[in-house]
Every structure is written in structure tokens, then in C-alpha cells.
């Protein structure tokens, strides 16, 4: 939580610095408008990040166009396009799919609108000015260490059944989360203390498109019904 707060504060600080550097200080006449594009309202962290960023920017004297895209890529593209055309001087974007914004961000680049990629890396575009994030690999190792501690893997007899799910394959963060967690857990999988009965371990197999909780649940339900009816299951959190 502290790291996400730090990332948020740094994003707000970058907004102020970039607008001032462009001669767009909020104190010079009417308030300059910042577009903030968040992926969804379905997860509390995005609600908190969006509302906190909006509050801090407004407190600093900027107008804010805050939009949530319901995890729909086309909706987010449309929202960003509207922000560009409605006079936003800077964009802060937490992308749904980091590979899908190249075309719309070309419009921002043509209008010389700076772009901050917030928490999720935007790829296939040279329109991004800054990337505000934190140590995502360490987040993954923390998740793995939590499971290691709770199951007492160094001392308990085991074996423990476990199934793995991770985030969107187009989100650079998901690969770091997965890598960090698996670097902690894989030695126990190789030793047989953790058993992945489905055999589904590699990133591409366990990835969840668009971080969809419904897709992740559907996959886990299918695995549990097929393989784990007679066994107790320990689930990894969505990485």
C-alpha cells in the first residue's frame, strides 16, 4: 500500500512539474485540465487511486477529467480520445492493455500532450513521457514469501496442492509479479512439496486476459472440478 501511495504521489508531482515546465501552471489564468484514465471501478485500488489523484490534482489547482473504462479496451481508447479533443494538457493512463493504445496516443503526440503511464507500462508507443511504478518483481516475491510462510514450507511435511493464476499477458507488471512469486515457490514445486495437479505452471497458460476476475474464477472452477474434488486446495492470489 505504501508503494502504491508513493507511486500515486510521484505521478501527481510529475503532473505539476510537466505542466509548469510547459508553461501551463494552474495559477496562470484558468485551471489547466488533466485527463486521468483508469481501467475499472470493479477493484477498490483503482477507485482509490483515481479518487486520490483527482483530489490531489484539484487541490493543486488543476481541473480533472477522471474516467473509468469498465475493463473495456475500446471504451478506454474512446475516453482517451475524448480527453485529447476536449483540451486536456496532460494524460495519466493506467492502461487495460498496454499494447492497444499506440494509435490513440499518436494523437496526443501530434498535439504535444505529455503522457504518464501509471502503474502499467504502455508498450508499442513513443508517446509516453514517464512511467510511474514501483518494484513489481518485489511485489511478486512478497506474495510468494507470504505463501511460503503461511504453509511453513521449510518445516511442514506437505505436500500441498496449489494452483497458479496471474494477470494479463499484455501487462508488463503481470510478468514481474509472476516471476517474483515463482522464484520463491518453484523450488518447492520442483521438490514436490507444492503440487500443481493441473500441470499448468508457465506464464502464458496461467495468465488472465484483462485481469478478468470472471475469467480467472472460471478457469479455477474448471481445474477444481476436474482434479481437486478429493483434495484440499490452497490457491495463489491473483498475481
Question: What is each model feature region?
Answer:
Residues 2-8, 22-239:
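A residue-level marker of the well-folded mature domains of exported/periplasmic proteins
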Residues 11-13:
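Repetitive helical segments and hydrophobic/amphipathic motifs
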Residues 17-21:
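C-terminal motif of bacterial Sec signal peptides marking the signal peptidase cleavage site
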Amino acid at each position: 500500500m505504501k508503494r502504491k501511495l508513493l507511486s500515486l504521489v510521484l505521478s501527481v508531482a510529475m503532473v505539476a512539474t510537466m505542466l509548469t515546465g510547459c508553461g501551463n501552471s494552474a495559477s496562470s489564468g484558468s485551471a489547466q485540465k488533466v485527463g486521468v484514465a483508469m481501467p475499472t471501478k470493479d477493484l477498490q485500488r483503482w477507485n482509490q487511486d483515481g479518487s486520490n489523484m483527482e483530489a490531489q490534482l484539484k487541490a493543486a489547482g488543476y481541473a480533472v477529467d477522471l474516467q473509468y473504462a469498465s475493463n473495456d479496451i475500446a471504451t478506454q481508447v474512446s475516453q482517451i480520445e475524448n480527453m485529447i479533443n476536449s483540451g486536456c494538457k496532460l494524460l495519466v493512463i493506467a492502461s487495460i492493455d498496454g499494447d492497444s493504445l499506440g494509435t490513440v496516443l499518436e494523437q496526443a503526440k501530434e498535439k504535444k500532450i505529455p503522457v504518464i503511464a501509471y502503474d502499467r507500462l504502455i508498450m508499442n508507443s513513443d508517446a509516453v513521457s514517464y512511467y510511474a511504478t514501483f518494484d513489481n518483481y518485489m511485489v511478486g516475491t512478497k506474495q510468494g514469501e507470504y505463501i511460503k510462510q503461511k504453509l511453513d514450507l521449510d518445516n511442514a511435511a506437505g505436500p500441498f496442492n496449489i494452483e497458479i493464476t496471474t494477470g494479463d499477458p499484455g501487462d508488463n507488471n503481470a510478468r514481474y509479479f509472476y516471476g517474483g512469486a515463482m522464484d520463491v515457490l518453484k523450488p518447492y514445486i520442483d521438490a514436490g512439496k507444492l503440487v500443481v495437479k493441473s500441470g499448468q505452471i508457465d506464464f502464458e497458460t496461467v495468465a488472465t486476459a484483462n485481469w478478468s476476475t470472471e475469467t480467472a474464477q472460471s478457469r479455477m472452477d474448471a481445474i477444481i472440478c476436474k482434479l481437486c474434488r478429493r483434495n484440499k486446495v490452497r490457491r495463489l492470489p491473483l498475481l
